Design a protein with these regions (language model features):
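Second-shell loop/turn segments in exported
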Residues: 9-16, 33-41, 60, 98-106, ...
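Conserved catalytic neighborhood of penicillin-recognizing serine enzymes
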Residues: 11-30, 126-181, 229, 240-241
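Active-site SXXK
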Residues: 50, 79, 98-132, 160, ...
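Beta-lactamase-like hydrolase cores
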Residues: 44-75, 158-161, 174
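A short, well-structured edge-of-sheet supersecondary motif
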Residues: 2-5, 64-94, 183-188, 237-240
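Surface-exposed patches in mature extracellular/periplasmic domains of secreted proteins
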Residues: 37-39, 59-71, 129, 193-198, ...
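Active-site-proximal helix/loop microenvironment
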Residues: 191-241
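Non-catalytic, structured segments within soluble enzyme domains
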Residues: 1-44, 48, 186, 190-197, ...
Length: 241
């Protein structure tokens, strides 16, 4: 009978929690797309590796009271986002862990230096082996210092960039022009650098501005595509449905 067949069926196993993969991206999609069905460009294998990496470094940085970090990975040839880790410990309600750090403006620090080198290389006003001065300077009262608090004299441009030296970067920006560099940064999509160039001044190259990891990573991907002579196109998070 139906009853006998029913009671002979084994009981289902206890339900398990569904895996949480890219929860910050899922939350973003939910807010921006109102729950509409979406297919992301995320590579599950890479995403899992990135989340494990973020968890491991979160434990390491936690000893220095650093509670938030994010990782964004873009595949240059396809220009698709393959990993999106907006923060760590999504399930925690404290310490800002539910903030998607990828979308949150942060001080640019030294991360804009490669864009200045790129812009000057592209126009031919800089060569990789060109010697740059790393000496004490005073520009209208602005006296930049290197992190080491030391001076190297004359340094090849490639080495100055690799070592993230501040003084060569400032003198290069002075030569290139703050308004011109400010315009270039806006052209490559750094939308949060939205005040006048005079507001930032030469400190623009030393962390005097804010940008999101999303915009900065997309700009680096643009630079990579340019160097590989690939056509420029917008970075994608979604696959066709």
């Amino acid at each position: 009978s139906t009853y006998e067949l029913a009671i002979s069926e084994p009981l289902p196993d206890e339900p398990h929690a569904l895996p949480q993969i890219a929860p910050y991206l899922v939350s973003r999609f939910y807010q921006e797309r109102n729950g509409e069905y979406s297919r992301s460009t995320i590579n599950k294998g890479i995403q899992t590796q990135v989340e494990d990496l973020a968890e491991r470094w979160s434990n390491e940085f936690g000893r220095s009271d650093i509670r938030n970090l994010a990782i964004l990975v873009i595949d240059i040839p396809s220009n698709q986002v393959v990993a999106y880790c907006g923060n760590v410990h999504f399930d925690r309600k404290q310490g800002g862990n539910q903030v998607d750090v990828i979308q949150a403006p942060r001080s640019t620090g030294s991360i804009l230096k490669p864009f200045l080198y790129y812009a000057m290389l592209q126009e031919g006003s800089l060569l990789p082996d060109m010697l740059l001065p790393d000496v004490p300077v005073n520009i209208n009262g602005f006296t930049p210092q290197n992190f080491s608090m030391q001076f190297e004299g004359a340094v090849p441009a490639s080495e100055a960039l690799a070592r993230s030296l501040n003084i060569p970067a400032v003198t290069m920006l002075q030569r290139y022009g703050v308004p011109k560099f400010h315009s270039f940064l806006q052209q490559i999509g750094l939308k949060t650098i939205n005040r006048s160039s005079s507001h930032y001044g030469l400190s623009l190259i030393l962390g005097g501005a804010e940008a999101t990891l999303w915009d900065v990573t997309n700009a680096y991907a643009m630079m990579g595509r340019s160097l590989l002579q690939l056509p420029q196109r917008s970075c994608s998070l979604l696959l066709p449905t």
